[in-house]
Amino acid sequence: MHAIRCLGLVGLLAATAVVQAAPVTYTLDPDHTQVLFSWSHFGYSNPGAYLGLGSGTLVFDEQHPERSSVRVSLPLSELDTHVAALNMHLQQADFLDAAKYPQVTFQSTRVQPLGGNKFKVTGDLTMHGVTRSVALDATLNRVGVHPMSKRQSIGFGATTQIKRSEFGVGAYVPNVGDELTVRITAEGAVAAAAQK
């Protein structure tokens, strides 16, 4: 009987380990996810703009992080420079042409662990109808149960630089900078139903 109990305990622990090792799917939180980008304005200043999250999903495999993935959609209707006239101009046809291309999307194609909490995330960025490969320098901030929501959560940041002209958005280059510096901060959580 003792042997049977031991075997049962071993089986339970093994099953628990499998569950803990399984990839976890997080839904990104629009209230705590921001994409900020800035550029040179004739060399005098470096104004910036904010893009809010439309939708986003992160699948994180803690045991095998190279199997992780992320997908996000950023509606240009959320673009905000804090200058109303500039918001409108950036969405017009000579820039982002938001009426024709209302979304910016990113789909990861590779996650490369660099040691510690650092990762290189490569993926397909689609903007203005053009898709190009982009590499993000990502930092995993924290994984665990959020003290307020009590849900399994994840937080990360990332940076990259892109040339807007490579996406067909080359108006006023080089006076208005071609290179965009992009900074991302994000939080996600497991759906409440998935934790029950």
Residue ranges and their predicted role:
Residues 1-8:
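Bacterial N-terminal signal peptides that target proteins for export
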Residues 15-18:
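N-terminal signal peptide c-region/cleavage motif recognized by signal peptidases
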Residues 21-196:
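Low-complexity, acidic/polar, glycine-enriched regions of mature
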Residues 9-13:
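Hydrophobic helical h-region of N-terminal Sec-dependent signal peptides
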